[in-house]
């Protein structure tokens, strides 16, 4: 491989890692006890920063002779071109042999094919918490609203049986239970909670 190009919509590479603050043992252990308004505010602030690449990872990538970082370069279009593709950004067209996409995280159970039979029954944060006017966050609102043991909760109590035995021990637990199943540093508190659940 002669070249690797990384495109970011942002004009600057994130430099603040909000996870460092959230990894403190007291925070990871006590986060689930916070009220919904506090959880919502904390996660809105967290998600507003994004996470930078690790220094080691970035240094190794940048040392690669064919590495190129394109900041402020959202993809405006992608079209086939022979055996490859052309990506157009505000800086112009770029031709590639192949594309690898990593476009962010959306934790909406409705997007998961394995949950298609019950997705409409799963409670989301939008169903359980109304943030103050002007502070709604669609990314947070789409997350499942989980019980204390990572269990999926129903929008309607009549649907509880349909969700029995379904747990979200993954990144989608972030809003309800904090850095639990979404980071190695959270497993110390998360695994016992999952087992008890």
Model-derived segments and their meaning:
Residues 3-197:
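Flavin (primarily FAD) cofactor-binding/catalytic cores of flavoenzymes
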């Amino acid at each position: 491989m002669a070249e690797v190009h990384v495109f970011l919509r942002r004009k600057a590479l994130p430099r603040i890692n909000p996870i460092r603050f959230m990894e403190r043992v007291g925070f990871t252990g006590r986060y689930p006890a916070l009220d919904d308004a506090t959880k919502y505010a904390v996660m809105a602030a967290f998600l507003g920063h994004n996470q930078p690449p690790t220094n080691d990872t970035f240094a190794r990538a940048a040392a690669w002779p064919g590495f190129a970082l394109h900041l402020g370069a959202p993809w405006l279009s992608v079209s086939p071109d022979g055996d490859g593709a052309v990506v157009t950004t505000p800086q112009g067209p770029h031709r590639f042999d192949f594309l690898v996409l990593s476009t962010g995280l959306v934790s909406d159970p409705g997007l998961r094919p394995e949950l298609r039979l019950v997705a409409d029954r799963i409670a989301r944060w939008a169903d359980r918490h109304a943030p103050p006017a002007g502070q709604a966050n669609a990314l947070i609102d789409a997350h499942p609203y989980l019980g204390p043991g990572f269990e999926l909760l129903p929008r309607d109590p009549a649907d509880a049986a349909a969700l029995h035995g379904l747990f979200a021990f993954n990144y989608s637990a972030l809003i309800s239970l904090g850095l639990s199943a979404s980071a190695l540093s959270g497993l110390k508190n998360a695994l016992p909670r999952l087992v008890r659940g």
